[in-house]
Amino acid sequence: MNTQIEEFDMNENLEILQIIEEWKLDFHLGNAVKHILISGKKETEDEELEDLKSASWYLTRKIQVLNDETCNWENVKDLTKTTFIIPVCVESKDRYNNAVSVLGFLNKNFKTNVIIHELTKDDSKLDFISSLKNLKINHIVEVNSLDYYHRTRQLNEMLNIVKTPVVVNYDIDVILPVGSYIESQKLILEGTSDFVYPYGDGEFQREISLFFNRNDFNINFDLQSIENKLLKTLRSKYGHCIFANTKKYIKCGGENENFIGYGPEDQERENRFITLKYNVSRVDNLVYHFEHSRTKFSNGDSEYYEPNNKLFDKLSAMDYKSMSDYYDNVEYKQKYDKFN
């Protein structure tokens, strides 16, 4: 489609919405035009630059949508036996940007199932997911006061409605090399593993700087487009994401909802799987984490932080029998039909 944009005389006082309607512009092009037009009316160069950056972002998203619509299906991998369960709370611009990049990456590379549980004070912030055509998305929006972040509950509510044999507890800020997704699903389906960490234990994490060129990445979703100097090497062991046999994940209690907010639930989860004698394995490859600003939802500044640590210490001291008894009788399971 070769559409040439005319130049507008701002003195003619044309209403922006009128322009968008007359040109029959879609969501992304409409917003790009809006920001371009209003940028010329700003009093300072900084204000003008912000609008031009916004226009650039919407144009990049439009390019991505067109890429997705014309993508080579031979390059889209089949993960239809897997469901990604992704808890989301868009409490910052960084988190929104990461959601665009991560979900766009999954959409570019896989045909798969995704359940998103979004906590929000009002309307959904994920205004782009309808363009992700390769993902079969179930988007749950929960209006919440956001006094605290109960991520473990979000995950269990999604886990309870998963219909595929493989499920992935997935962080909205991470991506993996494409082969790691394929190998992890294979290990679960073949019965070799009950749970798979799709990254190595050690210096396998690459933290992506806030200052990397996101517009370039969001066009082709190519990990090679991220400059090495903007990748920081960190250790990885827990968190990020984990592939699981759906039935066994449910059988051993899913997520422990007594952990509220930021805490050691990632460590507890691995310790539980090992104590209860499940087969846990790893794919020794990298995990890429998009950095984001830290809020009360992603640091230890919470009234629940100390109780979370005490619960972790209690559970870590349990043997097979005491842990089995605990998770067989834990109260939160009563809410979910598949957990009983």
PLM segments and residue spans:
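Active-site acidic short loop of glycosyltransferases
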Residues: 162-165, 254
